[in-house]
Design a protein with these regions (language model features):
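Nucleotidyl polymerases of mobile genetic elements and RNA viruses
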Residues: 1-355
Length: 355
């Protein structure tokens, strides 16, 4: 097991992410089981989850999430208030209870004989921690699934599926109401993508209490723990300020800021797209500044621009139409880098010939 730091200057144990380095045989077995289990996922995983499910895309979650947030952000009148809870799960893989995982697989209809196979790969795991590069002793875990294992994402997906029935049952019993996507549209109550979850409900202390009960039940059964330091809230503008504070105190979380992100993209955009995606240009500029100090050939600069720089905005552009100003600013940075290096090279060559 190797602990990879999440930050440049980690101070606490929570700032590290444990990465399991498995042997070849176990990875082959896990890969075979993963290829088998992913074939049945579209039939047993509800549409609210998109991660690792064949024929489902991350774009599905992003599209629905941004449409919902856009509608909520523009709702400034009315007596009904709504909110979005962006959940953050602490050490999601490491806290999975094996008994819960096994019962989930049996509940969704997987044969008992087949459930035994992935559970054996989980229960027969042992860890040896690398200290200064040397393996030291062995640890036999009693819960959790391995980071980096081919089968682990699918097992965690099944574990997260335990939250969906609780929310759907609350909707049926009118404990939660969800948020309507449009006039006459369907109600959206939750979107799950691995451990990135969005919960939609009315901004009332009553629904907040029911939501807390659901999360407490899920935490107790699955072993998962909500990280309240990173979990955030978003309210539509017409929500009463007193209600906001009451719900914030009940949940013990922070209200969402403009810099909050969902699946790698900003959740709450500015009025201008230029302001919202200004960080794209900043990322490009930082990369170029780092290369400027290095002696890179013309062919090397061309490869870096095409393979690295042009790939930076691709993910965001797949979802949003960038304004012409953003594209022009990025092009200007690249032209300055490209042209500036060429001029410096030409001057140095001319001076060397003159001498």
């Amino acid at each position: 097991m190797y602990s990879s730091p999440k930050k440049n200057e980690p101070k606490y144990i929570t700032d590290f992410c444990p990465i399991s380095l498995g042997n070849i045989v176990s990875r082959i077995i896990s890969k075979v089981l993963a290829n088998r289990i992913k074939c049945i996922l579209p039939n047993v995983i509800f549409d609210s989850q998109s991660a690792f499910v064949p024929n489902r895309s991350i774009i599905d979650n992003i599209t629905v999430a941004y449409e919902m947030l856009h509608r909520m952000r523009n709702r400034r009148k009315g007596k009904t208030w709504h909110m979005v809870v962006k959940l953050d799960i602490s050490k999601a893989y490491d806290r999975v209870e094996w008994e819960f995982l096994q019962r989930i697989m049996l509940k969704i209809g997987i044969l008992t004989q087949w459930v035994h196979l992935p559970m054996e790969t989980v229960r027969t795991t042992s860890y040896s921690i690398l200290i200064n590069g040397e393996p030291t002793g062995f640890i036999t875990p009693s819960r959790g699934i391995k980071q980096g294992d081919p089968l682990s994402p699918y097992l965690f997906l099944l574990c997260a599926e335990g939250l969906s029935p609780l929310i759907r049952k609350a909707i049926v019993n009118h404990h939660l109401k969800g948020v309507v996507s449009c006039n006459g549209g369907v109600k959206i109550s939750h979107l799950l993508f691995a451990n990135d979850s969005l919960l939609f409900c009315e901004a009332t202390t009553r629904e907040c209490k029911h939501l807390l009960d659901i999360l407490a039940l899920y935490e107790g059964a699955s072993g998962q723990a909500i990280n309240r330091h990173k979990t955030t809230l978003f309210f539509n503008p017409n929500t009463n300020q007193g209600v906001k504070l009451a719900i914030q105190n009940m949940l013990g979380v922070q209200i969402m800021t403009n810099c909050e992100r969902y699946l790698g993209l900003p959740m709450v955009g500015e009025k201008s797209k230029v302001s919202t995606f200004r960080e794209i240009q900043e990322w490009v500029t930082k990369r170029v500044i780092g290369w400027k100090e290095k002696h890179i050939s013309k062919a090397g600069r061309e490869v870096l621009i095409k393979t690295v720089i042009q790939a930076i905005p691709t993910y965001s552009m797949s979802m949003f139409k960038f304004s012409k100003k953003i594209c022009d600013d990025i092009d200007l940075v690249l032209l300055q880098y490209w042209g500036g290096r060429l001029k410096m090279k030409e001057k140095s060559i001319e001076s060397s010939h003159a001498s």
